[in-house]
Amino acid sequence: MSSPEQRDEVEMLATMLLIRRFEERASQQYQAQKIGGFCHLYIGQEAVVAGAVAATRPDDYLITAYRDHAHALARGTSADACMAELFGKATGCSRGLGGSMHYFDKANHMYGGHAIVGAHVPLATGMAFAAKYRKEDRVTLCFFGDGAINQGGFHEALNLAGLFKLPVIFICENNFFAMGTSVKRSTSLKEIVDRAEGYDMPGEVVDGMSFREVRDKLGEIIASIRKDPHPAFVEARTYRYRGHSMSDPASYRTKEELEKYRLEDPITRLRAQLTREGKLTNEQFDKLDKSAKEQAMASVKFAEKSAEPPLEDLYKYIYAENDETSEPAPATGRATKPAGRGTSAKNRRATGRTASTNGDSA
């Protein structure tokens, strides 16, 4: 398994560049009306997920909210599968049925992508409980925005995690705005990290614009959790350069504020650090950036050529039933035939089960 020391920083810079170029290309495709529904971009926040993933092992669990493209890419989901999902194609990481807010990649232990604000936080607690119950050496990373910290389920989940000493890290990506509402107008506490004290778990603040600070602090916390399981809370102070979603002009922010944070661009900062230390040349950076742009462009072409999900698959993945459970699509961007079709809708009605959907919206 990889450790933080083994993760090459140049490799993680390449991941951050891929996230940036993918999101820029997604923005263009959304404006061209090739992507429907909602689309939340991660531009500016790349250091948070890159640093966190660099501190984990591939078998650790990861779950996040609706701004999820970057988390999938950082965990190893292909750009092809990610873009195809945005296009609603069968080769997408959720077979074209999830869209932007519902990425899923079981092979890389990336469990969403959840549209309802804060609704996935209890799931993270459950995943950590399962790992501890099974005596698995796994840590769960749960990402959410500052807008989730006042949801009821958030408090219940952190209380149980603290009570049962579960191996989970709750990572608040505090970009200072819940949609257009400043955190100062929505939260009584001056410091979000102070929430941790109420659940008897350690709390840390990190500069979310610094890859190294995020990686190093998460590495320390994870090492502590592996030694003696317990939950932790991390407030990563970061900034998104775009609006809340593609429909948001972000008029609630000043140009001066935006320019201030652009000077702290996480990609520029890591590049400068590596260059000063003699680990990266300008030519090497240009090559990394070119590769990221090519991958993003290739993902668009892949998505355009991919097939639509067949109509008969519309209700196929609602139920998981014993040996007929359908496995999720692999993260290669290629569709595979599901293991089974499951029970028909008619038979389900006959058993008296009520239908449920995963069609969350926000």
Locations of the language-model features?
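A ubiquitous, low-specificity "background" feature that marks scattered single residues
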Residues: 52, 74, 132, 179, ...
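Glycine-rich ThDP/TPP pyrophosphate-binding loop and its adjacent helix/strand module
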Residues: 109-305
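Short secondary-structure boundary/hinge segments and terminal tails
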Residues: 47, 73, 179, 213-214, ...
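Cofactor-binding active-site loop characterized by glycine-rich and histidine/acidic residues
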Residues: 24-28, 32-164, 182-188, 193, ...
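Generic preference for hydrophobic/aromatic residues in regular secondary structure cores
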Residues: 101-102, 176, 201, 318
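A general secondary-structure junction signal
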Residues: 66, 236-238, 318
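Conserved acidic/glycine
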Residues: 1-48, 246, 250-251, 255-362
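Mixed-charge, polar/low-complexity N-terminal
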Residues: 3, 10-11, 15-16, 21-22, ...
